[in-house]
């Protein structure tokens, strides 16, 4: 009966037509969000969800929002940069389908590049340290990439040196994510605007792990151009800590795309803090992510606790399934029924 009365009242409203239009638009928009047909896989990159943490955020009026970059088709934030580097090089006439592409990677960029290379018809050669997870290696090979390993001791510096040498010998086109401006350009044109729109301009702090520094450089550049100040916080491992995807670069290997003036503060994150926060995100927030994402949220928690009323945005770089073989989600890390 109540429903009938409400319907009758609604039908007698003078703005009934406007209500119909709004209702139909909302329905159409929700349907669009649920299932959108696209012509190519690359059209599904970006426009990732921004989710508010419900249980980990401090009770001081601050908010922590995380951008779920694992929702990209190859599973990480690096999908954006990979697409940008290849598409922009194509526009300049530097590469064409059938060419050999070379890149040094710690994992996620390699997977993303392998996906785009498969999609567009390139041959992909990827160089990485041999201590990266088996899941990452398998994903690259699944996309058809050739994987070349350097030793753990050589690390990413060794992988970068070998990639450069291969390029100089004419073995392929080096994309060079560490010095390629098309890397941060992807985040200047997509990630930054998305965050600004999704927070309705309320963001006060942006927190990002620093690997190639492409994400923090591009997002920061965009946010600096908006009408309100936003504090930019970068994260690097503490001395002696090892966090996949985050680096404490020696001066001679600092990525050329990095602009220190775009970062207000750099926090040191211990490996244990990153891993513990990663597991807490899974157990308490239902967000299954990788170690560098745990580091980003650990940094965001520091910022939020120290800044009541802050609106903090952090990047969830990838998904946790790429780290299962490393033991970071082993049973020994969880107490029965309680999680951590």
Regions found by a protein language model. Name each.
Residues 4-7, 95:
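Short N-terminal alpha-helical targeting/association segments
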Residues 11-25, 29-340:
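PLP-dependent amino-acid enzyme catalytic core
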């Amino acid at each position: 009966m109540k429903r009938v009365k409400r319907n009758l009242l609604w039908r007698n409203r003078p703005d009934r037509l406007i209500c119909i239009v709004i209702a139909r638009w909302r329905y159409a928009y929700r349907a669009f969000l649920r299932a959108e047909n696209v012509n190519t896989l690359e059209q599904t990159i970006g426009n990732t969800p921004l989710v508010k943490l419900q249980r980990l955020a401090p009770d001081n009026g601050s908010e922590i929002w995380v951008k779920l970059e694992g929702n990209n088709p190859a599973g990480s934030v690096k999908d954006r940069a990979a697409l940008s580097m290849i598409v922009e090089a194509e526009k300049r006439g530097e590469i064409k389908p059938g060419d050999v592409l070379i890149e040094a990677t710690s994992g996620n960029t390699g997977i993303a590049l392998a996906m785009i290379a498969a999609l567009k018809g390139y041959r992909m050669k990827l160089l990485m340290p041999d201590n990266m997870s088996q899941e990452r290696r398998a994903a690259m090979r699944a996309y058809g990439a050739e994987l070349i390993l350097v030793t753990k001791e050589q690390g990413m510096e060794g992988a970068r040196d070998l990639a450069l040498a291969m390029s100089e010998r004419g073995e392929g086109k080096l994309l060079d994510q560490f010095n390629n401006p098309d890397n941060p350009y992807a985040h200047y044109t997509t990630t930054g605007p998305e965050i600004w729109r999704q927070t309705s301009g309320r963001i006060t702090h942006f927190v990002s792990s620093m690997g190639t520094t492409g994400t923090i450089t591009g997002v920061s550049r965009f946010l600096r151009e908006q009408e309100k100040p936003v504090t930019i916080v970068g994260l690097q491992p503490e001395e002696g800590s090892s966090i996949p995807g985050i680096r404490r670069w020696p001066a001679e290997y600092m990525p050329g795309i990095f602009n220190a003036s775009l970062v207000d503060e750099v926090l040191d994150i211990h490996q244990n803090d990153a891993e513990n926060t990663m597991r807490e995100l899974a157990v308490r927030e239902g967000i299954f992510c990788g170690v560098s994402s745990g580091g980003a949220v650990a940094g965001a928690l520091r910022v939020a606790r120290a800044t009541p009323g802050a609106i903090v945005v952090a990047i969830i770089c990838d998904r946790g399934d790429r780290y299962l073989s490393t033991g970071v989600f082993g049973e020994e890390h969880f107490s029965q029924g309680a999680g951590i």
